[in-house]
Amino acid sequence: MNHDSSSRIVSRVKEWIAGAAPGAKLPSTRQLVAEYQASPVTVQKALRTLTAQGLIESRPGVGTFVRAYRTARPSDYGWQTAALRAAQTARPLNSAAMRSATNDVIAFHSGYPDRELLPERLVRAALTRAARGDAALSRPPAQGLPELQTWFAQELSTSTPVGVTPPQPSDVVVLPGSQSGLSSIFRGLVGHGQPLLVESPSYWGALLAAGQAGVNVIPVPSGPDGPDPEELDRAFEESGARLFYAQPNFANPTGAQWSAERGEEVLRIVQRHGAFLVEDDWAHDFGITAQSVPLAAKDDSGHVVYIRSLTKSVSPSIRIAAVIARGPARERIMGAQAAESMYVSGLLQAAALDVVTQPGWQTHLRGLSHQLQSRRDLLVTSLREHVPQAHLSHLPKGGLNLWLRMPDGFDVDQLTKDCEAAGVLIAAGTEWFPAEPEGPYIRLNYAGPNPGGFPEGARIIGAAVQAQLGL
């Protein structure tokens, strides 16, 4: 019989079940065949559908019965409280930036670029080619595919000045995303209970990784030009820290880019204290009116541990990043990484390498820069018109975000709730601070979907701000 016959039987038996008691026995297959004038195959198909829907259950050798619904007994997990003890970190395990959004909201909260800004054609073609190659069925080297190691090393080498030894492919460790790399770096180079200096504000994922690694996070104030050198030097002196985590180019959330002079001063401080600088170049591919200039390119003495991700610029489904470290530090990181994930999917590595070595990749990046500038400027213009109370200290030259200070005493958590109720998602700035926030901030992503909705989104934010201020 056809599919319609099976569906008809399912519908009729459901009506019968609705009037039957739990545990009631259904007519036999032979009876159902006769009643519905269908073949045994069609009847069995209908019964399988009802079983999958949880309406009936079969007891071999006995028959088929209406399934009895059991009231679920509440589970008691109280014993785990004593077993787990205190949580290792009080930070939430997920950021507002990771929330999924429905199509009927205006989303400024996300930490990722919209699908329209991704090289979709290149990604699909790369995945197809990778699936046909050896990478689909073979285990890659623990440190990564040699060709991908070479690409990452060459990318950093292009910024290396004369007189500085460029990195070698052997200095590269490929990672399953930068988040995993940060965790390995903090565990391998800092260690549980030891001090770690971080910019404040700083990337929430780095703060989460630090908390999970059990390190003692010490904030260093940072502004549009980078961290305060005197405060950084003092933090090293007082804490005895041997590692400073920072984002010199288009920092998340502020969008700040260090000046060349500030970068050199920070590097001198790090070297003087015999410490490491972990340079997170997360926005390398998101330059708008300036390009990322890695500080690691100026260091060949192993003080700078450089990490770069392709996840946001290639595809969130291709979680590939790399860390470039020289000397014993690389081995420490490699050991910590191996304990977490023994190797990175060769299929994803091959696909990522395919994308970034295609001629269309550079063409895509040029177009991406123009699109980001257009979106950034549209959102800034809309905010100036509708939310004049939000102060933008500087216009980011790259990255994905605007970092806005609200008036003193403003409740940004309440603002996020009010905006969400009106169909706009924003991110409160509190989660980007390693300690108490220095003021009320919000972060808005201008790389999100539907830029045509930016003016309306800004209008809704402005209305919520005015309501809270009583204007």
Language-model features: where?
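Conserved core of the PLP fold type I
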Residues: 135-273, 285-298, 372
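Hydrophobic residues in well-ordered beta-strands that form the structural core
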Residues: 198, 219, 279, 352, ...
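Conserved active-site segment immediately N-terminal to the catalytic lysine
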Residues: 291-311, 331-334, 442-443
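Short beta-strand
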Residues: 57-58, 391-397
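AMP-binding (ANL) adenylation modules
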Residues: 431-436
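N-terminal basic, amphipathic alpha-helical segments
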Residues: 1-128, 338, 344, 356, ...
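PLP-dependent aminotransferase class I/II
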Residues: 305-385, 393-394
